[in-house]
Amino acid sequence: MKFADHLTESAIPEWRDKYIDYKVGKKKLRRYKEKLDAEEEQSSSYRSWMPSVSVYQTAFQQREPGKSRSDGDYRSGPAFKKDYSALQREFVADFIEDWLISFQLSKCNEFYLWLLKECDKKFEVLQSQLHYYSLQKNYERDNLNRSSSNVDMSTSLYAAGLAGRSDSRVNSIDSDSRSVMYGSMPCTKEAKKPRLSLLAYCQKVLKDNRLLPSWPKRGFSLLQDLRQDASSRGRETFAFGASFLETMTTTQARNLLSNAIIEYYLYLQLVKSFRDINVTGFRKMVKKFDKTCHTRELTTFMSYARTHYTLFKHADANVQLVAQKMQQITSSQPTPTSELSSAQRDKEPITWLETQITEWFTTALTNSPKDRKHNTHKLKKLTIQYSISEQMVHRNNRSIVQMLVVGLGIGVSMTLITYTLYLGISSEETSFTHKILFPLWGGWYMVLLIAFLFLVNCFIWHRTGINYRFIMLGEIQSKNGTQFFNNDFATSKIPLKLYFLTFFIVPCAVCSMLSFALEKLTPLGFLYIGIVSFLFLCPSGLIPYWDKVVHTRKWLVVTLIRLMMSGFFPVEFGDFFLGDIICSLTYSIADIAMFFCVYSHTPNNLCGSSHSRAMGVLSCLPSYWRFMQCLRRFADSGDWFPHLLNAAKYTLGIAYNATLCAYRLSDRSEQRRTPFIVCATLNSILTSAWDLVMDWSFAHNTTSYNWLLRDDLYLAGKKNWENGSYSFSRKLVYYFAMIWDILIRFEWIVYAIAPQTIQQSAVTSFILALLEVLRRFVWIIFRVENEHVANVHLFRVTGDAPLPYPIAQVGDDSMDSSDLGSKAFSSLNDIPITPSHDNNPHSFAEPMPAYRGTFRRRSSVFENISRSIPWAHATDFQRPTVNTVDDRSPETDSESEVESIM
């Protein structure tokens, strides 16, 4: 594999702009090659190419890293004029000094320093959490044979915690953890838990499956909170109340800390990957430059970079440390891991941090040798292997078999479905086939079509480098390691999901074909419902690869239940995303009423939308569910914008479907027509504007090259490497999407102005429903792309790892027992990880917060809203926690990394 492809495969999507632009460098070298060849042809004399002293070796050693070079300093170096030709000196100045060092290396080094700053802050939080965990474990050990209230335990725990916060916290963690680990408490088991009652068991099952209802965190104090400072607002909530700490056990705390440490360890691996692959890229780029321009700059460049840039210093220290360890292993010398890592913190901080958290994970958070062995094995699986793609994907690529089944199944199904559509459209309008079979089976077709188009969306995101899996799942699961960042089609699991969907499409096509042929709904309608139920409940061994889609089946069922009970649960990505998709499936949902009407005593000719109120009620449900989700988001975060405005939008959606139903039931009377047109017009205008401005973040930019578009357009391909602009032809897809979305939003006009025969036609309803599904297909592409853009601007690559104990600002010792209620539940990402712009010379301009709690001083309402609009889409949901807190010990992963990919 070429290094450029390897860099593309290994690059973390959210950090892609911070890597060395290797392909641009190759294009520059090709241009230099052409100039050199042209000069060689024009030259009549032989030109000797001799190795030289570096152009920038003497002139730049006096320059501090990060400061810009003056042209006079560079051109005044004596070595600059001595050995190279004029063209060579021009290339060295333009490529190595102006582009590679001043731009590319400075960019990578500054971002690496920012990552190190973030790693240190998260490490301090975890260090504090381990200290509290040790105190709690000591407390429970000392009070094992006597009872004490949970409130007293929390108070004494944090009193001791505040008293013990000092510079020697690392040593206290080590000593405290060793005093309670299995070494000094041989095989000590926790007190036997009493048998759970039926109610407690049901609550536990619901909590494990994210189905336990919860009160909004800010629901009862929302009016008072509206006047509080913005720093206390916008916090996310999960399925835990303010008294979370009062019921926290050491096992629950250990599980939460284990998940947080795993995610932090994986984050360190990603930082190390970023550093190492960039160092390799710079070395290879200078080597290519030497080969193209006949120079010998590699040695001097590497020496200069190791001296002046932290990126190269740490990479070189890591190589030396690995070599030292290998030498000690081969010579059978003891390796003082702790002492060595402590001495290397300044030289190689990533390795030092890895050593510390490995010690915590395998010692402080284990109760037995078995737990230690399990945790050690778990960390080993998280180590990045650059050859993972070639070794695992191409040798045992099961996706080939899965795609073969998909191709055969969908190919046959499309033939049968097309024929049934022909029969339904060509049948008489009063026939059972046209009025009953065509709408009912058409509703199933819409559900399967939107599922198939969603997987097409996944392929588009996969090809354009959009990290949709992080957005969908909320975080990187530990058992999957770093495979999400390996850009191979087999690792995307798209073939597996298509394989899963094929088992629903093929039976639907066969059953619908038989139903149309026999002109009967019974028993084929019930048969297909039974097949769908069986496929969701099917044991893993009956269908090949069915054990690989257990999580998918469970996720669909759980998310659908959470959607139907919107308002009782915090809104996660899957909840709001599935809700938006179902808003485009009102045609299918309304058919549920028709299905029951067919088997009731009602005549079949009265089961259509022109006679059924139930169909109108069901068509309002998707908008109602999203309305309740918006209210829950407002109750959780306390931010009226954009959640209340979004709720108003879905209120118009309910009004639109209700007035459409009333208009149909009134036999298209003028009295009902006017309210319908008013509601439909308002709904279309607001939803179209919301799609473009809020969900897609369009129509903000009127000055740059991308008129009305964002600055980052992943579907437009690569930017021009010379001027940084996108090709206009590639940007047209965004403008077409904007026009398409607006046009389909106004498709209701057909019901208002078309002749009555067209309005009442089942074919018209089917076509309009199909257009809405296609509009949603386009909407999904740009909605997820916009979410990815937000993650890129925030450099967000991990989810929220919940922590068992309150956290304070890093370096802030002012937390006391009064904070237990307000900070009872925290996450590793609650701390301010952005470096200070005043104290850090390598700072980044991050985007404006996606939401604001209170209006800041000297800012108007309009100014606050206008600043929030570009990032408001990120507040539609809150990221799920890493794991549900329970009393179970960490379980062994059900499948290996290889099995999870294949």
From Swiss-Prot:
Side Cytoplasmic, residues: 1-404, 457-497, 544-554, 600-732, 783-902
GO cellular component: fungal-type vacuole membrane; mitochondrion; plasma membrane
Signal sequence extent: none
Residues that bear Phosphoserine: S172, S179, S859, S860
Single GO MF annotation: phosphate transmembrane transporter activity
Side Extracellular, residues: 426-435, 519-522, 576, 754-761
Locations listed in the record: Cell membrane
Keyword annotations from UniProtKB, A to Z: Cell membrane, Membrane, Phosphoprotein, Transmembrane, Transmembrane helix
Residues annotated as domain SPX: 1-303
Protein's membrane topology: Multi-pass membrane protein
Gene Ontology process terms (BP): cellular response to phosphate starvation; phosphate ion transport; signal transduction
Region (Disordered): 882-902
Miscellaneous remark of the record: Present with 1160 molecules/cell in log phase SD medium.
Record function comment: May function in G-protein coupled signal transduction.
Family: Belongs to the SYG1 (TC 2.A.94) family.
Protein name: Protein SYG1
Biological source species: Saccharomyces cerevisiae (strain ATCC 204508 / S288c)
Gene symbol of the encoding locus: SYG1
